[in-house]
Amino acid sequence: MAEKRNIFLVGPMGAGKSTIGRQLAQMLNMDFIDSDAVIEERAGASIDWIFDIEGEAGFRKREERIINELTKGQQGIVLSTGGGSILSKENRNALSARGIVIYLETTVDKQFERTQRDKKRPLLQTEDPRKILEAIAKERNPLYEEIADITLQTDEQSAKVVATHIIELIDNLQ
């Protein structure tokens, strides 16, 4: 990869965006940024708290500002986005115009397995989280596909294997 372009990871919660993103950034000697972590840092509060106080709409406004800022003002970063970031047309436009978008795909079964004990997932704090995951997938998967330059299935693969595959596929894009 001669020129360092921005790499944006999109996909559902539990797809491995943060874990794979860190691995990928390390392998490419690039900076890794997690948009959810930046939102929490700037707000001085957890995403759970933001959802409780401002609702999902308030959180999405914060997310839109942060994604615009991070994608506009940086070059050569690996950015892990929140699972719902693609709900915003502005975010989809910014991501697809300012870097290579990698859709990390995973099954609802694998998502459920990876997220069932995680209490920091406000959308899953419900009686039937699997049903919520299925509804979210139905709504969001077409949006991930719409902006993806590359789609990779992450079930049953280590972060290192997926990151290596991403590097190979990006090299083939250029």
From Swiss-Prot:
Annotated Mg(2+) binding sites: S18
GO-annotated cellular components: cytosol
UniProt binding sites for ATP: G14, A15, G16, K17, S18, T19, R121, Q157
Transmembrane segment boundaries: none
Binding site for substrate: D36, R60, G83, R140
EC number: 2.7.1.71
InterPro entries: P-loop_NTPase, Shikimate/glucono_kinase, Shikimate_kinase/TSH1, Shikimate_kinase_CS
Cofactor dependence: Mg(2+)
Subcellular location: Cytoplasm
Pfam families: SKI
Cofactor note: Binds 1 Mg(2+) ion per subunit.
Enzyme class name: transferase
The reaction(s) this protein catalyses: shikimate + ATP = 3-phosphoshikimate + ADP + H(+)
Record key words, sorted: Amino-acid biosynthesis, Aromatic amino acid biosynthesis, ATP-binding, Cytoplasm, Kinase, Magnesium, Metal-binding, Nucleotide-binding, Transferase
Domain of life: Bacteria
Pathway linked to the protein: Metabolic intermediate biosynthesis; chorismate biosynthesis; chorismate from D-erythrose 4-phosphate and phosphoenolpyruvate: step 5/7
Keyword Membrane among record annotations: no
UniProt record, GO biological process: amino acid biosynthetic process; aromatic amino acid family biosynthetic process; chorismate biosynthetic process
UniProt family annotation: Belongs to the shikimate kinase family.
Subunit structure: Monomer.
Record function comment: Catalyzes the specific phosphorylation of the 3-hydroxyl group of shikimic acid using ATP as a cosubstrate.
NCBIfam families in the cross-refs: PRK05057.1
Record-given protein name: Shikimate kinase
Organism of origin: Haemophilus ducreyi (strain 35000HP / ATCC 700724)
Record lineage: Bacteria, Pseudomonadati, Pseudomonadota, Gammaproteobacteria, Pasteurellales
